[in-house]
């Protein structure tokens, strides 16, 4: 029950979005609602029943029906719709390609004659939005569904424009103690975390999140203009609760350390007021400014991890996907034990990293909407469906039942233990899990609605900062 409660709270953060039907476009919808009464003298009673159904596209009508069905009922609809056909999916994660064969096997367990060909595409360099936009111009699209990240662009480019539709599986809603009608937000497959890690071969330690923006520090980080979820992290720091975390961790610094940061914080007071931020907004802007002007931009988290776990990376740190530790190959100079996860260390103060979601959507012009809904339900409501992601540490299912089954199968919480079960071999690989990371670990969770709200204010301010250049 506790895990379910935590999950629902996190949905309000990592998956929160306006309860806007994708068919609605912001301004025209409002104009229609406000001008209609002026143009007619008919009683309002006649308008009310007609409004709701007309707002639903054909795919949204299917989704509405599908949200009342169990996975098995959806599976039967999928079998009728897609037997012998071709299924195209597109996503930021390549693992959809691994999940689809398992989904097909599941459908074959219901009807042994079922067969479906598939292709899964993973566009690079944030091109997924362009690809989905182009596909939306067709009467019937190529892509049946998508697995996509970056809540800010999803909200502004995909949902408000009616390109993508949210489907909330009944079994997922039940597991989270809610209903499709009551839940407002996007459907997250999982939350991923990027965490502060530092090379510990030397004596240097980082025991406060302000240490990462101290004088002379240059953390390894994927550039905020190449992976936009990293920019969303900075947006989120300006929200009142996360800004308060930064103030709190600042106050835990020594007087000398505070003295270094104080001028920047003071300088940001007027900026925070201009941007309409809360009482602690200056602390957030100061941290963001110091971070953007100091991080050493990298192209991918894999190379960052490879750098940090090498003994030669003494005194370096990075902010990167936690799960990258899974693929470290131990050698005389390379080891997971050459790094520490900052938030796992006793006495660490402040944010431990940030969390962002992979969201699932049906395309509004989906050629196979029932099959898309069934596939989405399979991934979010069964441990087998989530296993393509769940087999590795650092990816947390949004379904508490699936999360529990995943841990029971893969034992990520003791992933760093030796075979005897008592010796800690690699402390950093003992994944403390979603519940810990979103409480004690102080993970900053992406909120798509908040990011979209501040993208033109805080976002424009960030654009004016001068990035650090290692060259």
Give the positions of each predicted feature.
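Bacterial lipoprotein signal-peptidase II cleavage site
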Residues: 12-25
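N-terminal low-complexity, Pro/Thr/Ser-rich intrinsically disordered segments
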Residues: 30-82, 265
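Short, polar/charged alpha-helical segment
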Residues: 52, 71-79, 93-115, 196, ...
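Conserved C-terminal helix/tail region of periplasmic/extracytoplasmic solute-binding proteins
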Residues: 52-54, 58-67, 72, 423-471
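Extracytoplasmic ligand-binding site segments that recognize negatively charged/polar headgroups
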Residues: 85-105, 118-131, 141-306
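Paired acidic/hydrophobic, glycine-rich loop segments that form the ligand-binding mouth/hinge
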Residues: 140-149, 314-322
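Extracytoplasmic/periplasmic substrate-binding proteins
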Residues: 282-283, 293-365
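Mature extracytoplasmic/periplasmic domains
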Residues: 358-442
């Amino acid at each position: 029950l506790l895990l379910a409660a935590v999950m629902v709270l996190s949905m309000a953060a990592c998956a929160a979005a306006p309860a806007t039907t994708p068919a609605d476009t912001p301004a025209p919808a409002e104009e229609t609602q406000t001008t209609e009464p002026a143009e007619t003298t008919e009683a309002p009673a006649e308008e009310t029943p007609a409004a709701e159904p007309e707002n639903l596209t054909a795919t949204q009508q299917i989704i509405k029906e599908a949200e009342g069905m169990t996975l098995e009922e959806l599976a039967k609809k999928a079998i009728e719709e897609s037997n012998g056909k071709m299924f195209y999916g597109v996503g930021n994660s390549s693992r959809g390609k691994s999940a689809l064969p398992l989904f097909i096997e599941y459908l074959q367990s219901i009807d042994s004659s079922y067969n479906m060909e598939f292709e899964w595409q993973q566009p690079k360099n944030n091109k997924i939005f362009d690809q989905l936009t182009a596909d939306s111009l067709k009467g019937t699209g190529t892509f049946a569904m998508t697995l996509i990240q970056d809540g800010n662009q999803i909200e502004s480019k995909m949902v408000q424009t009616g390109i993508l539709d949210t489907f909330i599986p009944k079994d997922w809603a039940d597991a989270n103690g809610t209903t499709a009608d009551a839940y407002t937000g996007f459907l997250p497959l999982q939350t991923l975390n990027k965490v502060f890690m530092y090379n510990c071969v030397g004596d240097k330690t980082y025991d406060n999140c302000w240490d990462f923006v101290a004088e002379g520090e240059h953390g390894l980080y994927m550039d905020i203009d190449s992976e936009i979820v990293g920019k969303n992290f900075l947006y989120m720091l300006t929200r009142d609760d996360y800004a308060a975390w930064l103030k709190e961790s600042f106050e835990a610094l020594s007087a000398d350390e505070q003295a270094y940061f104080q001028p920047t914080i003071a300088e940001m007071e007027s900026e925070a007021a201009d941007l309409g931020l809360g009482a602690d907004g200056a602390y957030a802007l100061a941290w963001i400014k110091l971070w953007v002007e100091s991080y050493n931009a990298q192209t991918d988290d894999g190379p960052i991890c490879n750098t940090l776990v090498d003994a030669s990376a003494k005194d370096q740190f990075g902010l990167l996907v936690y799960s990258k530790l899974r693929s470290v190959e131990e050698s005389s100079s390379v080891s997971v034990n050459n790094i520490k996860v900052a938030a796992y260390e006793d006495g660490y103060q402040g944010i431990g990293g940030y969390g962002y979601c992979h969201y699932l959507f049906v395309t509004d012009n989906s050629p196979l909407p029932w099959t898309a809904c069934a596939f989405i339900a399979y991934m979010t409501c069964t441990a087998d469906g989530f296993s393509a992601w769940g087999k590795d540490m650092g990816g947390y299912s949004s379904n508490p039942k699936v999360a529990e089954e995943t841990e029971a199968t893969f034992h990520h919480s003791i992933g760093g233990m030796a075979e005897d079960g008592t010796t800690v071999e690699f402390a950093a690989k003992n994944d403390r899990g979603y519940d810990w990371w979103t409480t004690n670990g102080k993970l900053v969770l992406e909120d798509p609605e908040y990011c979209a709200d501040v993208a033109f204010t805080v976002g424009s301010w960030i654009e004016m900062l001068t990035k650090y250049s290692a060259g």
